[in-house]
A protein has these predicted regions:
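Short, surface-exposed polybasic-aromatic patches that bind anionic ligands, especially phosphate groups
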Residues: 1-151
């Protein structure tokens, strides 16, 4: 990327990007200290989970660059976007890490934000939202982008 060291603040954040820890490489303390620490932590992977902080009930979708979009409305509205099991996708982010995100426009219509992975009941097809449009993701593209079915 840019030669800097980025910190995953929580295991759940890491697992939104990778399915396991098999790609983590152990390096010496000397090597580690030679890599500049980035000024921000890694945020939840866009389109994979919904987030909230423990002290506020608002639920947010995450888009590129760690931008949060409040999913405005009631539970039925959230279900229309993310399915009946939408609450299982909500990850509590510790308040101290909430500053890693920035706030964008709220989601007020049943339109998925860019970067969201979408599947439909009864279909094996997978889509990603790009420029407001659904784009089918092939198996090769799914694997190459390290998408995960569980997210």
């Amino acid at each position: 990327m840019d030669g800097q060291r980025y910190t995953f603040p929580t295991e759940k954040t890491y697992l939104s990007w990778f399915s396991d820890f098999s790609r983590v490489r152990t390096i010496s303390d000397a090597e580690l200290s030679g890599i500049q620490l980035a000024m921000k932590n890694v945020t939840m992977r866009p389109g994979t989970q919904l987030v909230k902080i423990t002290t506020n009930p608002q639920v947010f979708a995450v888009t590129a660059g760690g931008v949060l979009h409040w999913v405005q409305g009631n539970e039925a509205f959230a279900a229309s976007l993310y399915g009946s099991n939408w609450a299982r996708r909500v990850v509590d982010v510790p308040d101290s890490f909430f500053t890693n995100f920035s706030i964008g426009a709220p989601i007020t219509t049943a339109v998925h934000p860019d970067g969201t992975l979408v599947t439909y009941a009864g279909s094996a097809d997978r889509f990603v939202v790009v420029g407001g449009q659904l784009r089918r993701v092939t198996d090769a593209g799914f694997s190459a982008n390290m998408f995960q079915s569980g997210n």
